[in-house]
Design a protein with these regions (language model features):
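A conserved mid-domain beta-alpha-beta active-site/ligand-binding segment of alpha/beta enzyme cores
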Residues: 178-197
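A conserved beta-strand-loop-helix scaffold within acyl/acetyltransferase catalytic domains
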Residues: 1-105, 109-111
Length: 209
């Protein structure tokens, strides 16, 4: 496992090991001022040194307004990389959780596991690495809340629960695609500080068994 806060280095790692999914806008150092005080990335490597897993977190300063207010204005800054998104036709819907989330808020993204490595799927690795990232987040960034977006097909497979997320808001984000009838639907998942503290007391085996 390697952890860092130099997102230019992280970008280069992705170009080498995850070229099909380059760095997304929320963690682009050309857009945001990212450093050890407000962000970190985490990668895991296999026995051959290849990157098999990524995730990252960064702080949003929402002391003056709610996450719902922020995302109504800025949800397009969380556009997924790859699909041909029609930003004008896309939308964000604030749920009751987002309307009360404020303060020091961490966005959790860049979550990826190499599809080619079937040996790691079903092993509980995502839960282990997710727990580790939350621990770093609590110690390094001390958030009041953590949130992220999960694609609907992925959340139906239970990823958010394996990571330990205790709240989810369905139909929170919809990315329309150019020249296609279907849209990419996403849930917003989140935890408050007390949720994080409680989750850390749960034996890991109870999340991955």
């Amino acid at each position: 496992i390697e952890i860092g806060s130099d997102f230019n280095k992280y970008r280069l790692l992705l170009l080498e090991h995850r070229p099909q999914q380059p760095l997304g806008p929320p963690f682009d150092p050309n857009i945001h001022q990212l450093n050890a005080k407000n962000a970190f990335w985490l990668i895991a490597k296999g026995p051959d040194g290849a990157v098999i897993h990524t995730q990252a977190m960064r702080v949003l300063d929402l002391k003056s307004f709610s996450l719902a207010d922020h995302l109504r204005e800025s949800f397009r800054g969380f556009t997924p990389v790859g699909p041909d998104i029609d930003l004008a036709a896309s939308r964000y819907r604030a749920g009751p959780g987002a309307q009360k989330i404020c303060g020091t808020v961490c966005y959790h993204g860049e979550l990826w596991m190499d599809d080619r490595l079937g040996a790691y799927r079903g092993s509980g690795l995502s839960a282990v690495l997710g727990r580790f990232a939350f621990l770093i987040c609590v110690k390094q960034l001390s958030p009041d809340y953590v949130f992220g977006f999960v694609a609907r097909p992925v959340i139906f497979k239970g990823l958010a629960e394996r990571l330990g997320y205790m709240h989810s808001e369905p139909a929170s984000i919809r990315w329309r695609l150019h020249n296609k009838d279907r849209a990419l639907e996403g849930f917003m998942v989140w935890m408050a500080r007390d949720d994080l503290q409680f989750m850390m007391t749960i034996p890991l085996v109870d999340l991955v068994a």
